[in-house]
Every structure is written in C-alpha cells, then in structure tokens.
C-alpha cells in the first residue's frame, strides 16, 4: 500500500490544471496548421472582400463628391442664368416702358396734328362760308340797294357798271360805319 500511496503522491504532485505535454505539442501543431491555412487562404479572402468594400465606399464617396460638384456647378449655372434672365427682364421692361412713352408721344403728336388739321379745315371752311355769305349778302344788298335807290332817285340804274359802282360804294360805307362802331365799343 505504501507503493500505492507513493504513486498517488506522485500523481498528486502533478498540477491538474496543466495538460499533458503531448496534448500541448499536438495542440500547437494543430494551431500552426490551422493558422497557416487561415493565413494562406482565409485571410486573403477577407482582405480581398475588405479591399472591395473599401474600394466601393471610396468610389461611392468619390461619386458623391463628383455629383455634389456637378450639383454645385449646376446651381451656379442656374443662379447665373437666373441673374441673366432677371437682367434681361429688367431690360425688356425698360425697353417696353421707353417704347410705350415713344408711342404715347407719337400718338399725342398725331392727335395734335389731326386736331390742328381739323381746326385749320374748320377755319378754312368758316372763311369760305363767310366769304360765300358775304358775297350772297352783297348781292342781295346790292339788289335791294338798287331797288331802293331807283325808288329814291326816281331813275333807273339799268347800267350794270353804274349799278356795281353804286353797290360797292354803299357797302364800303357800311363797312366803315361797322368798323367805327366796333372800335368805339
């Protein structure tokens, strides 16, 4: 029994938490084999996937930056076109205002010319009518004056030349009397 105790004592001196040496060696060999396979085959695939993702992300960022730059350029172009359109609209409004004022001035000038023409035509017509009326009145007055003169004088004024001279003298005397009475007022 003492021998059993000694064997048990020897067995007890061994730490139960530590594995046997052969287990450690085989574990290291397996770890190296798995590590080699992982390093040779699996890790490059992970790196390839990560590189592709990084490239996609970088490409996406680059495309986003390009799109943002294009949008910024388009916005600047839009703003420039808008400013140009506003300037052009202001110029068109100013041109329209100027043309409107010119048209109004032309229409006023035409209206004034038309008015002057109508007034001149009316004055000419009045002068012509006045001359016609004066001529008709002179003729009537002449006949009436000759008739009265024949009755007053008692002789016939059959001679046209005498008649015309007498009528003209009478009318001239009437004009002078009318002018003197108008100047006296």
UniProtKB/Swiss-Prot annotation:
The keyword Cell membrane applies. Belongs to the ATPase B chain family. The keyword Transport applies. It comes from Rhodococcus jostii (strain RHA1). This is ATP synthase subunit b. Keywords: ATP synthesis, Cell membrane, CF(0), Hydrogen ion transport, Ion transport, Membrane, Transmembrane, Transmembrane helix, Transport. NCBIfam families: ATP_synt_b (TIGR01144), PRK05759.1-3 (NF004412). Its main location: membrane.
């Amino acid at each position: 029994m003492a021998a059993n105790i000694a064997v048990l004592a020897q067995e007890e001196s061994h730490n139960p938490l530590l594995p046997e040496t052969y287990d450690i060696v085989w574990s290291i060999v397996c770890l190296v084999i798995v590590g080699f396979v992982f390093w040779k085959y699996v890790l490059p695939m992970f790196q390839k996937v990560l590189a592709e993702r990084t490239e996609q992300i970088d490409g996406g960022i680059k495309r986003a930056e390009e799109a943002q730059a294009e949008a910024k350029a388009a916005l600047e172009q839009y703003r420039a076109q808008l400013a140009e359109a506003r300037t052009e609209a202001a110029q068109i409004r100013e041109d329209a205002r100027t043309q409107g004022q010119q048209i109004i001035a032309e229409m006023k000038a035409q209206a004034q010319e038309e008015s002057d023409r109508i007034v001149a035509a009316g004055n000419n017509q009045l002068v012509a009518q006045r001359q016609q009326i004066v001529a008709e009145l002179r003729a009537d007055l002449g006949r009436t004056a000759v008739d009265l003169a024949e009755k007053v004088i008692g002789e016939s004024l059959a001679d046209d030349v005498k008649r015309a001279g007498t009528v003209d003298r009478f009318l001239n005397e009437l004009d002078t009397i009318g002018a003197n009475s108008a100047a006296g007022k």
